[in-house]
Amino acid sequence: MPIRQMKDSSETHLVIKTQPLKHHNPKTVQNGKIPPPSPSPVTVTTPATVTQSQASSPSPPSKNRSRRRNRGGRKSDQGDVCMRPSSRPRKPPPPSQTTSSAVSVATAGEIVAVNHQMQMGVRKNSNFAPRPGFGTLGTKCIVKANHFLADLPTKDLNQYDVTITPEVSSKSVNRAIIAELVRLYKESDLGRRLPAYDGRKSLYTAGELPFTWKEFSVKIVDEDDGIINGPKRERSYKVAIKFVARANMHHLGEFLAGKRADCPQEAVQILDIVLRELSVKRFCPVGRSFFSPDIKTPQRLGEGLESWCGFYQSIRPTQMGLSLNIDMASAAFIEPLPVIEFVAQLLGKDVLSKPLSDSDRVKIKKGLRGVKVEVTHRANVRRKYRVAGLTTQPTRELMFPVDENCTMKSVIEYFQEMYGFTIQHTHLPCLQVGNQKKASYLPMEACKIVEGQRYTKRLNEKQITALLKVTCQRPRDRENDILRTVQHNAYDQDPYAKEFGMNISEKLASVEARILPAPWLKYHENGKEKDCLPQVGQWNMMNKKMINGMTVSRWACVNFSRSVQENVARGFCNELGQMCEVSGMEFNPEPVIPIYSARPDQVEKALKHVYHTSMNKTKGKELELLLAILPDNNGSLYGDLKRICETELGLISQCCLTKHVFKISKQYLANVSLKINVKMGGRNTVLVDAISCRIPLVSDIPTIIFGADVTHPENGEESSPSIAAVVASQDWPEVTKYAGLVCAQAHRQELIQDLYKTWQDPVRGTVSGGMIRDLLISFRKATGQKPLRIIFYRDGVSEGQFYQVLLYELDAIRKACASLEPNYQPPVTFIVVQKRHHTRLFANNHRDKNSTDRSGNILPGTVVDTKICHPTEFDFYLCSHAGIQGTSRPAHYHVLWDENNFTADGIQSLTNNLCYTYARCTRSVSIVPPAYYAHLAAFRARFYLEPEIMQDNGSPGKKNTKTTTVGDVGVKPLPALKENVKRVMFYC
């Protein structure tokens, strides 16, 4: 467990110097608060030994190697980024020798000893925005949350460093070693303590062990030797245990009570490990979740995969005290099948009678590489191996040397002579195990896949659909499963929970919530309905016209679907044009050129033909819109089309799938017309409060709202860059139109590198640029005013990255503003938006139809800022959308920085109201639109990476050209968006 270095006088601090606003707008006095001061740029105080250049250009924090949600795998849910003690502890003193009582400040990652009383570090004093109070707006109600109150231990917890020799990389082997050590020595040398272990370097006890350092000898059975009946091989290990630090429970108690702002994060992490200890032994751990085929019957996902059900578990500090967050989870696992059966499922064909093609071999190799198998051809031995590859030759042709004289023997002969095993399917290749220098061959029919291996590669569309069916649970069913899980885990009988003095409630937390009112939406005066009040998060376009409908005079259509005849395509385009007209646009019924049919593999040729032919027809006037009809399964076609249109030709495009062309739905056409209008630069609707200037801390002075996100490559793409996207509102006071910019950056880099940048120009000298600066300039061009307030919604940041993201990106915002004019420092509010969390809110009474929507979920607008939220910081949960199926996931908003002095009601209402302005549908959405748009833009930009190999599901895959290596700063930039594309919401 990481131990933090104590702060000394040379530590870097964040210092914000404020200065009074020289010019006030009287409207800035909102919510009973004075106008916020306009701060000067962030200044970083550094030790005297740091040079001026180092101080002015701090290098960004190191990249986070973890993965994101739909953007990757697990991230840290709690705590700050911290350093682990050296894996090689200093040689312990002899038992008779005492340590000096003087204070010694160690180097980073080492231990600070103060009179033998070693205390665990706390989170960096980040000075995140404190909670300004609790919200009062809305209709009060009670909801239940999947949080279970946990008692705080009364004893201080002790941490010990564990060194196992020889070193072991496997957590499961480490755990087996420590389990055997506890079995042997608990009653004697361990003083009857039952320690909890993290599987790596740290051991924890409630109370001290009878020593500060001790070495033990342990022998454990080698499970991988595979012997079933008979003596098993034993391995011997030395285990050194050394006292490291103590976690102060009183400090944690004060933090939970709101009396201290600094969280003793290691103490929380220890308690998390304690409550996981028994589950680690019972189930298959994956990140913070646990899975088992015994919880529910596994469901087949196809191609040799199955779903396992499980549960997520995490201890969290909240206002009500320590809270155990329990949620249901599902994951894809490799079915424990005979390898031949797995291969047949993977390929979807009989492999025993039909020969394998080269593409079959590639697919088998990808599917089995890294998978653990056990042999079945030996009666009493089930030895396990990890697959390294596949032989290029069939089994019948495989020969290998059996002695130093290179005497060759066939694999068939070897297995017959050694094991009496006759290989039946000699046309199949063998599995290759071991390393390349000393490879071993195993016939497929002699191997079975080991149970409990999680599948970490990308799922195809069918597998995703099948997995979603398993995970999609109605709220009442999910709540019942969570309660059953808590009862099954029986924390009251958990020996580790008892040892550490932790009692867990078996009741869901009952939480006070409020339902915020939906905002009034403004539509065009020419419509029958000029404004609208959404009902339960929904409304429609009947009798309404877009508030700013655009004109489409010059358009064309390309048909890439063989099954769509020209007359069908023409009829669809007519229907779509009429819907645009009904919705408030002007749409020319005739295309510039007749509908052009093309093959999907000739997308570039077709698009350029349509572009140039149209230009000739219109005498140089460019197309305003390109409609494209695509096959339902279109592979790379969609991405190629978007890349060519947006980065080469400067065309705004709208794609439609064949199934929608044949089965025309009014609802579908209405939604497509909404997308077309904003892509053309229009607005569909705006908040009534926005145009009447009644939004606190937005309507009073020119305000720009940003959204930012970073998406990472899928598993297995170890060299593809991450994509960052930033969008910003371009209209005020409406705050509805958002321009977007994208950039590629180093693999898995979470901090957005291009927010602000400078470079040297031979003529102009130092030149400033970056996405923030460019969007501030475009706001001024669009509105005629410079922004005097910034609201920044940042998506996709885990709690462990809060500090470094705020430090780095707030500094970039400051520098971007200062580069535009001296002393230009508008106040900033920086809010992190999180959807990848496991808090779920349930109606207090599922039978009360007035407290739920049609899906059984809590009502849209439900906000919670008490009990399950942070003890002192400014955060809240908001369920802003109506559920469709499954259990709604509320978004979690954490205000890290607030120079605009928002009240709780102010930021909660603004966020909820913005969720009704999402351009692509007539529903409120689950996260604030600027963050949503940034995610869409980042996802779109991944198609710009060329050349790409598209996977079966149409998502960008690995590059087939030389790519940037991990950590390389020289990432190849994305092709630039054309200027006319940048100005509009092209990503919608």
Swiss-Prot record:
Piwi domain segment(s): 625-946
Example GO BP: regulation of translation
Main location group: cytoplasm
Induction description: Up-regulated by REV.
Compositional bias annotation for Basic and acidic residues: 1-11
Tissue-specific expression: Expressed in roots, stems, leaves, developing embryo, siliques, inflorescences, provascular tissue, shoot apical meristem (SAM) and adaxial (upper) sides of lateral organ primordia. Observed in the floral meristem, the adaxial side of sepal primordia, and the provascular tissue.
Stretches the record annotates as Disordered: 1-103
Listed GO MF terms: miRNA binding
GO cellular component: cytoplasm; plastid; ribonucleoprotein complex
PAZ domain boundaries: 338-451
Location of this chain's protein in the cell: Cytoplasm
Traits of the deletion mutant: Defects in meristem formation. Shoot apical meristem (SAM) terminates to a flat meristem, a small radially symmetric pin-like structure that lacks a vascular strand, a radially symmetric leaf, a single leaf or two leaves fused on their adaxial sides. Abnormal ovules and embryos. The double mutant pnh-2 han-2 has smaller inflorescence meristems (IM) and taller floral meristems (FM) leading to fewer petals.
Annotated S-S bridges: none
Keywords: Cytoplasm, Developmental protein, Repressor, Ribonucleoprotein, RNA-binding, RNA-mediated gene silencing, Transcription, Transcription regulation, Translation regulation
Biased composition (Low complexity): 41-57
Family recorded in the similarity comment: Belongs to the argonaute family. Ago subfamily.
Additional notes on this entry: Plants overexpressing AGO10 show upward curling of leaf blades and double cotyledon-like structures.
UniProt function note: Involved in RNA-mediated post-transcriptional gene silencing (PTGS). Main component of the RNA-induced silencing complex (RISC) that binds to a short guide RNA such as a microRNA (miRNA) or small interfering RNA (siRNA). RISC uses the mature miRNA or siRNA as a guide for slicer-directed cleavage of homologous mRNAs to repress gene expression. Required for reliable formation of primary and axillary shoot apical meristems. Specifies leaf adaxial identity by repressing the miR165 and miR166 microRNAs in the embryonic shoot apex, in the shoot apical meristem (SAM) and leaf.
Record text on subunit structure and interactions: Interacts with GATA18/HAN and KNAT1/BP. Interacts with RICE1 and RICE2 that act as cofactors.
Name of protein: Protein argonaute 10
Organism: Arabidopsis thaliana (Mouse-ear cress)
Gene that encodes it: AGO10
